[in-house]
């Protein structure tokens, strides 16, 4: 097998789960002895200009196949891939080996054109690797794809969070409409009579308009002294945020996996997620076996009938507030979630696991099954 060429979107600059996965995957592949070249590709992916698509095509051998003993194997981030279906089809015709790494399927509401581009891109690929079973299931049902590989994210070992008094609730995600921090603020406003503090940790520059909405919601309820908008944190600053936390909340409208879920669990922190998203897989895949304790390290909240396009139906915050109230007031619930999170810590896989799975998938010696149609 020749060197691996990982093509990633250059326009996603905040600390997204996809960026973290890509970086850790590269580290893992290199640790296994693979030669890896990382190429950030300019463009407003998945949208792009003709010039950007032509350059992308040249990087995957769409116009002229790179031959020789060191012929590279391309792995294209899914966000880029869905923007270049023509180029991927040309690369396939040229015999160039090109894989697609899917972090998040195209949202269903994106329209028929976007979904068709996704289907064409994935069918043209040599193979498709998904970073969650949820994403693989969506693509299989949506496009009839087969032979999809799954390489779940790994998790770094982490120190046990000390927690805080009063209990501290944390949401770690860029301030984006999909992450629905406004829902979190509205839920917290409904339990203001209880003792708690909260922090929203994540980039406020990814979508400044939405970040403004989050700040306005905090101010409207007079919660500036209780809800801290921390901005993006990395390294020890992020570790300090985790150390203060007693509960993590991730209620994204769509989530393929939710690496911050397992990151929280690695610190022994239980998590509340939205039912019907891939975050449920993250919450449960390393959880204690049902026969042993039967308790998840947190819960998945059902928002059926409340998830409008803006996520601001009045029932949503009330449902989340009820869950948070129960956790704050019921010692049995709080202790059970914490115990399950502590047990889960030792069961979380490291980053060597997805690296091995990806390397096995793209290896010439690995039996291939083109995505095609099932």
Put a short name on every predicted segment.
Residues 47-51, 310-319, 329-364:
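A charged, aromatic-enriched C-terminal amphipathic alpha-helix characteristic of glycosyltransferases
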Residues 232, 240-245:
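Short alpha-helical donor nucleotide-sugar binding micro-motif in glycosyltransferases
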Residues 129, 161-190, 199-201:
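Conserved donor-binding/catalytic core segment of Leloir-type glycosyltransferases
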Residues 134, 154:
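Carbohydrate-associated surface elements
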Residues 106, 110-130:
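Membrane-proximal helix-turn-helix segments that form the acceptor-binding/catalytic region
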Residues 197-216, 231-232:
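Glycosyltransferase donor-sugar binding loop
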Residues 270-273, 280, 284:
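Short hydrophobic beta-strand element within catalytic cores of glycosyltransferases
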Residues 253:
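Aromatic "clamp/platform" in nucleotide-sugar-dependent glycosyltransferases that forms part
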